[in-house]
Amino acid sequence: MRTALLEVGLEELPASEFHSILKQLEEKSAELLKAYRVSSGSVEVFVGSRRFGVILKNLPERQEDFTEEKKGPPLNVAYDENGKPTRALEGFLRNNNASLENVVHREGYVYLSRVVEGKPVEEVLPDLFRDLVLGLNFRKPMRWGSGEHEYIRPVHWIVAMVDGRVLDLEIFGLRSSRISYGKRYHAGSIEIPDSERYYESLKKGFVISSHLERKKFVLEQIDEFEKRSSMKIERDEELIEEIVAITEYPRIVVGQFDRKYLELPEEIIVTAVKHHQRSFIAHKGTLTNTFVAFQDGPQPPENVVKGYERVINARLEDARYYFQKDLETPLEKMNEKLKEIVFQEKLGTLYDKVERIKKISQRLCEDLKLPGSFTQKVLEAASICKADIASKVVYEFPELQGVMGRIYALREGINEEIATAIEDHYSEEPQTVIGSILGIADRIDTIVGNFAIGNVPTSSKDPYGLKSKADTIFRIIRKNEWDISLEELLTFASSLVGYRLSEELETFFAGRFYQFLINELGISFDVARAVNHLWKKPLRGILSAEALQEISEKPEFQDLFVGFERVHNITKNHDSTKFDGALFEKEEEKKLMNKFYEVKEKVLKALERLNYREALQYLIELKPYIDEYFDNVFVMVKRDDLRVNRLSFLKNIDELFMMVGDMTYLVKRSQV
């Protein structure tokens, strides 16, 4: 078995593309191996800051053989009246380098059918690797040189080998070779003797090509530091992944910043050091002034440590200055400054947005029937929920939006419940009631406002993150078990920006509700479709979905779905629910009517308690009465008044079922 290697060497890759490249390499390698009929025991992909590629192990000597078929002339054209080949057939065979032995007859035509022997793997791999490299997609490709080529970054070298043999491959005007390059400024060219020794060869040039091995190396160095220092480092997965993405030979750097900066709020210190210097802060019960960073290359000299310390101290000094200046300005005054900050040109300033958030929050409090004293707390929190955006610290460190609002509010002696909500309302899973109310109000205002001015997300583009905001609204409603009308809330929010609730906006929320049920709650596709019309009251839709999901697999409920389908199909084009029981001629009509009234009362009471499982149990009581009705009553009679009256009566049953879900989808599933 053989081993193949592809390495593409480029200028420094953006860390933001790291996971995308990794995923694409894995998926496209598998696709191309299948397309080129090459089996591989394992596929190892690697991505570094200056290279990416793939190692294919346990490759066969050749492609798999395949049977080639080609359609030829019709039989009446291919043979004469004596059954001998005509010139048409002979020409077809000659052009395809085939003989009569390869001919088969099917569906009135001549077909060539022959086994094509697979090519040697070294002849196949160049095309496979070329397709792999050129098949990757990037958000922001760039051109270089004469502008002829476009890629994520300029490509400087290509290594393509099978075992110890260099493959004949050319991409971007570069011919493949066995020469790679080590860490910039620390190692020059590196000759790869064969594919199996790729990783060990690169290590000599201070390059750990495998991202998995780099991550392991980072964690080992952190473990060693903790044992040596008796301090702890929080394993921040996001930061670790970023370090792995931007380095090829990560070596630990341990330094200290001035202890006076420990007087700053911990969030400021961590943000300044983590987000802006990609460093960890060591803990020893509490935050210490020791930081851990990672330098790319060999063991860093002392001047590198000093450089890190100088930069971090300067960053923290700036943060201290901004923080002290902010403490001189109350949140109320910061809020006034929002009048000078544009939220969106057509939607006014951030101050305007805050005013809308207050109104939507108040409406939500009314819908939830919250006491006036609590509503007042909500409105106080809403009035300052964006104030810290005008602060100097948030201007410098946008990641601290909301966090600084909480800190400043507590410093001013503002109620802790209100202060916490300022930060909490930004969360995708708010932990407080006030934060949840503000979170819904803020997101609804953003979504409605963007739809009002034409910023509508598509399947591929959502620059304002409206889909995620809608998902969070559903998540908050479910967590708090709030039985509210989202439709009414959207209508109210729309009026605040001079907009009318549109079909486009309704379709958007219905679509997000469907995805939320499937992706977050694990609801099956058919059940999600069955309750999708209930998105306007999300909690009811969610509870209905969970109840239907639970019972839809039980045999005793399959009859219920069939009964509903009979009613639904005959009434789907009928709108009226007004009927006169005096017009009923048959006993089965009267029996179903009486049972309907009995069941309806019980179902409505169950739904009032949000008990959808109980409601479904009551609905099943209708099944035998529905069967008797359809067995003995002909609905579509010629007499107009009887026909319309019967349809209108059945429409009542249909609408009662629809309050729980459109079970026709579940009927279809049960019949699969």
From Swiss-Prot:
EC number per UniProt: 6.1.1.14
Compartments where found: Cytoplasm
Entry keyword Plastid: no
Keywords: Aminoacyl-tRNA synthetase, ATP-binding, Cytoplasm, Ligase, Nucleotide-binding, Protein biosynthesis
Name of the protein in its database record: Glycine--tRNA ligase beta subunit
Gene: glyS
Catalytic activity: tRNA(Gly) + glycine + ATP = glycyl-tRNA(Gly) + AMP + diphosphate
GO terms under cellular component: cytosol
GO biological process terms on file: arginyl-tRNA aminoacylation; glycyl-tRNA aminoacylation
Family indicated by similarity: Belongs to the class-II aminoacyl-tRNA synthetase family.
